[in-house]
Amino acid sequence: MVKTIAIASGKGGVGKTSLAVNCSVQLSMTGKKVALLDADFGMANSHILLDKKVEKTVNDLLENQLDIESVLHETSSGLKLIPGGSGVLELLNLDHQKRYEIIRALDPLRDEIDILVVDTPAGASDASIEFSAACDAVMIVLVPEPTSFMDAYAFIKALNMEKKFNNVSVVVNLVENETAAKKSFASFKKIVTKFLNIDLEYAGWLPESKTIAGSIVSRKPAILKKSLEPVLSKNFSDIANYMANVKVTKTGGIKFFNK
């Protein structure tokens, strides 16, 4: 059975897409069959981080009725990318029916992959909530700033209230060390559990890194760089391992692969 994991964030600029790309590549390198759906439709940029020129995108699924195999782009690590399309106005405001069509379009991959990673749009938009709720688990990325906490809480609240979804974990990005990361997580969890019936899990942390910043410019995932700091290598590996073994809880509503 395919495990599906959404990578989300309450706001942009916290490292969500970088985490989604690097952990997807890491999972692929461990032998898992992984597909990455860039669901930030119209503003998608996962293909840039992977240095992959794409001709077919999700827009071709919708407008040209192509099948999912026609828009898959395999990378050097074995990761299969489903690009969301960038600069396509029609993708910026997809309605519920179009989002449903995309979710169902992935059904043929059921027997071809082990894990589907979904890079959702930042914030608590209808698209972000719907694609997150269609997954088995959601991993939210935040940074130790009040605005990030507030926006991440708003996202989790919307996900819980609208979709009754509570399988959520947290990655703390841009922190000095694990002690600081766990302190930030504990503070955030205290806020969430005070108002919502959700038992957040800690999934890992990442430090601020010139390697990650440079990887965006060089269009090569940080996890593939020889200059990758040992702490980053370990942390990406730990987070990817968490993703591979994340608990799956049954919820109602529309799900990837008709679960």
State where each predicted segment sits.
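P-loop/Walker-type NTP enzyme "switch/lid" segment
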Residues: 37-111, 214-218
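Beta-strand-loop-alpha "switch" segments that mediate conformational coupling across diverse proteins
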Residues: 196-223, 236
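Hydrophobic residues in beta-strands of the RecA-like P-loop NTPase core, especially within AAA+ ATPase
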Residues: 36-37, 118, 172
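NTP-binding/hydrolysis catalytic cores, primarily Walker-type P-loop NTPases
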Residues: 217-259
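Walker A/P-loop phosphate-binding motif and the immediately C-terminal alpha-helix
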Residues: 2-40
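Conserved catalytic-core segment of NTP-binding enzymes
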Residues: 121-204, 214
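Hydrophobic anchor at the start of a short beta-strand
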Residues: 33-34, 116, 138, 168
